[in-house]
Amino acid sequence: MSKVSIIMPVYNAEKYLCEAIESVLKQTYADFELLLINDMSTDNSKQICIEYAKRDRRIVLLENNSESHGPGSTRNIGLDYATGVYIYFMDADDWIDDCLLQCAIHCMQETEADIVEFGVVYELDTGQSTGKCCWDGKLILQKDEIKKDFFHFWKESPLYLWNRLFRRKTVKNIKFESIFNGEDVCYSMDALSKAEKIAHITDAFYHYRYLEGSSCHRWVESTIECLGVQWTHQCRFISSLLGDADPLPYAGPAYDNYMWAIYQLSSIFCPLPFREKRRELLKLKEIMGFDRYRGIYPFELEHGLLRVKFMLVKYRLEWIILLLGPLYYRVVKRMRNIAQRKE
């Protein structure tokens, strides 16, 4: 068997940490090391890690005592310690199916791929599943095939960390950016640029828990800076694959970043007044040169409310989303609560 290193940053995750660790210990593939990296937690997370490390020698507790904190720099500590042939990243508030490692490693060995991707189930904190995201396309892709149908690859392959198993020798020289958000996208972009073959499993093994108000869904002062760094990595990947002459391949990530900024700015958790929200969005627009891509996105790929939002952006009416976003959020949340009470 070939060892896999599972890297899990831990920060104030005591409510969900046991479930995450237990889901790893239940794996049908036993040759792994679970690296728990405590990032200065102020709750009981560290003690939970200590207790599990005493019970199972495959579990190692590491500490991020550096001046740089956050998920990126914390994962880098795990990468420096990892000894596995394969690398897998997992968050401390999620959980995985028992067969994840077995299926992903079998696929990687059978296909000789550099990266194996699998599906994700989206879960609410109430225990209700809200859907899943699984690959819909050719199961094995060479780099040249990604070039031929880049937009399909981009739309169908979300840039998460935790729906991918990496071959260690492929990503050995890649490190995480020390940014508050988007470090996972940056790493995924750099890893994809190194991969010659990507294999897909159509089953969903990872359970992502959506936590209202969590750091990745919350506006912070560095959000625009993080999106700018993310854009740099995305452009580097696309340029290495397709060059710079055609702006169309860049339109997908450009819209992804711009819409993500709009989503965070229009959330009820964003404290900025309307004028400041527009100013922040203008910063991102200038960083990315967004107007170059505004009208060339293939809008027929989007449907329903999302398409409406994309069309508003196309015609420079994103201020409407910023203005009505908080109201929309409250209405949707109220409807969701009513539906849950009926169940």
Task: Give residue ranges: language-model regions.
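Cell-envelope/extracellular polymer assembly enzymes that use nucleotide-activated donors
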Residues: 2-5, 23, 33, 186
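Short, well-formed alpha-helical segments that are part of the catalytic scaffolds
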Residues: 12-26
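A conserved acidic beta->alpha catalytic loop
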Residues: 30, 38-47, 66-68
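Glycine-rich, basic loop-to-helix element that forms the pyrophosphate-binding segment
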Residues: 64-82
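Short aromatic/hydrophobic "clamp" motif used to bind/position activated sugar donors
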Residues: 87
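Donor-binding/catalytic cores of nucleotide-activated saccharide
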Residues: 92-200, 206-224, 243
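Catalytic core of nucleotide-sugar-dependent glycosyltransferases
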Residues: 205-211, 217-245, 260-293
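Membrane-interface aromatic/basic loop that binds lipid-linked glycans or pyrophosphate carriers
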Residues: 269-343
